[in-house]
Amino acid sequence: MIKMNDITRDGNPVLRKRAEKLTFPLDPKYLKVADEMMEYLKNSQDPAIAEKYHLRAGVGLAAPQIGLSIQMASVLVPGPDNTIDLEETLVNPVIVSQSVQIAALEEGEGCLSVDKDVPGYVPRHDRITVRYQTLDGEEKTIKLRDYPAIVCQHEIDHLKGTLFYDHINKENPLDIEDNAILIG
């Protein structure tokens, strides 16, 4: 079970490396890692388990965040009324198209690997199309918008060695395009 002590923190060079592409069939150790990453997300979103193990809530976890420089990320995005908007482990994900429309989270973004609040808007594309492989190697394409799109862009950034605060305007953190959508 992944716990907060297992999360790679900002400053560790693995978070700034471009992750290695995976080949199929996946090594069984990577299948286990994928299960553990999704388990962390589920546990972190369960208030009782999160409190018991002192887990910070997360909606996404990329392999570099647990010290592995491989192109794999798990996302578990809750929807309204206890539904799930997106539950998937993305292997070798690539954003193949994106909207011109920019969006940002009204409250800003956070990250399990960044232990401090970093205020500011993180401009993202409101709609994206992502091509990736499943854990079985099947190629899939998904279209995402709003919050799920932001979550996936955040996780895919981890695979490129980019952290969310790299996108924040350094001179004016609350500066964003006039027509940007604030989600929150």
Swiss-Prot record:
Coiled coil: none annotated. Binds 1 Fe(2+) ion. It catalyses: N-terminal N-formyl-L-methionyl-[peptide] + H2O = N-terminal L-methionyl-[peptide] + formate. It comes from the Bacteria. Its cofactor is Fe(2+). It is an enzyme of class 3 (hydrolase). Keywords: Hydrolase, Iron, Metal-binding, Protein biosynthesis. One of its GO terms (molecular function) is metal ion binding. CDD domains: Pep_deformylase. InterPro entries: Peptide_deformylase, Peptide_deformylase_sf. Pfam families: Pep_deformylase. Its EC number is 3.5.1.88. Fe cation binds at C111, H154, H158. The active site is at E155. GO terms for biological process: co-translational protein modification; translation. NCBIfam families: pept_deformyl (TIGR00079). Belongs to the polypeptide deformylase family. This is Peptide deformylase. It comes from Pediococcus pentosaceus (strain ATCC 25745 / CCUG 21536 / LMG 10740 / 183-1w).
